[in-house]
């Protein structure tokens, strides 16, 4: 009996000592932890939560911007694909050589397309007159020639009525073809486009590349070579031209507007037009040049031009929505 009581007391003592030791250990750990604890008042907590919210808002904004950027990129890819399909469909109707270029000048879209079945320059017809006008104002600003009322009137007639006599007088004032070709070289850096003879005269064809026509439209929209005032004069002369109702601008929807300079020589199968078109907050340039194998019959090419202007404009409009 005594042995049993001893064992009982001994066992309880062990339990007590173990509990006591654990208590001491726990107290030490708690004190050590407490020395590292930072206590915050309400003001500190407000700052912490404010910083936390700020970081989360910044992360959310970054995620949103990235998502928006991807969405815009997808929209832009879709627009480029749609315009590419339009060009392919319309130019498949043309029996001959062609070049087509489209480029965003202003707005959220990013279109810069060039379709062609020939790398050779094409006869320019009257589209060369845009370059003659730019050259005239460049030389006026340089002081090489004087801006007389007669010259200003001829530049306007050259662009608005496509008057060949007025054009040839402007060429004479400039001193000949080389002056215009120097301006073209400054604009484009290449020799794809060139003035080789007076308008409606015999001789070597005046030549153009639609990429250069787009560059000319860029110069009118955001002038670098000539002043904004003179660029505006050219654009005003390209408003309500005598071909507005027959080519790229003919079937423009009511929500769009544009200016243009066309060229044609139906008895040689030549049909061309270049335009700047506004739709919503978008402004784009569109240039088409064709030299067909059907002389004296340009009805099909005129229809292609009208369709192209209308359908490409509608594509940009859908992008805007």
Whereabouts are the PLM-identified features?
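Short, well-structured active-site flanking segments
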Residues: 138-156, 177, 228-231
């Amino acid at each position: 009996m005594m042995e049993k009581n001893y064992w009982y007391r001994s066992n309880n003592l062990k339990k007590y000592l173990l509990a006591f030791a654990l208590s001491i250990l726990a107290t030490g750990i708690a004190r050590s932890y407490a020395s590292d604890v930072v206590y915050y008042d309400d003001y500190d907590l407000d700052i912490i939560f404010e910083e936390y919210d700020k970081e989360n808002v910044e992360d959310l904004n970054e995620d949103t911007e990235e998502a928006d950027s991807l969405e815009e990129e997808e929209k832009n890819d879709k627009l480029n694909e749609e315009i590419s399909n339009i060009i392919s469909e319309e130019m498949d109707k043309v029996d001959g050589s062609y070049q087509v270029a489209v480029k965003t000048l202003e707005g959220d879209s990013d279109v810069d397309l060039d379709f062609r079945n020939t790398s050779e320059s094409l006869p320019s017809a009257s589209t060369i007159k845009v370059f003659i006008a730019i050259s005239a104002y460049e030389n006026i600003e340089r002081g090489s020639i004087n801006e007389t009322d007669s010259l200003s009137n001829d530049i306007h007639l050259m662009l608005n009525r496509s008057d060949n006599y007025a054009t040839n007088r402007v060429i004479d004032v400039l001193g000949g073809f080389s002056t215009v070709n120097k301006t073209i070289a400054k604009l484009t850096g290449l020799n794809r486009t060139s003035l080789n003879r007076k308008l409606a005269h015999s001789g070597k064809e005046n030549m153009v590349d639609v990429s250069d026509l787009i560059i000319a439209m860029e110069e009118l929209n955001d002038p670098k070579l000539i002043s904004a005032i003179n660029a505006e004069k050219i654009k005003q002369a390209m408003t309500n031209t005598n071909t507005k109702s027959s080519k790229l601008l003919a079937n423009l929807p009511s929500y769009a507007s544009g200016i243009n300079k066309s060229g044609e020589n139906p008895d040689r199968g030549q049909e061309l037009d270049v335009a700047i078109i506004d739709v919503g907050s978008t402004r784009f340039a569109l240039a088409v040049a064709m030299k067909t194998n059907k002389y004296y019959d340009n009805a099909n090419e005129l229809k292609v031009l009208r369709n192209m202007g209308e359908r490409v404009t509608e594509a940009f409009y859908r992008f805007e929505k």
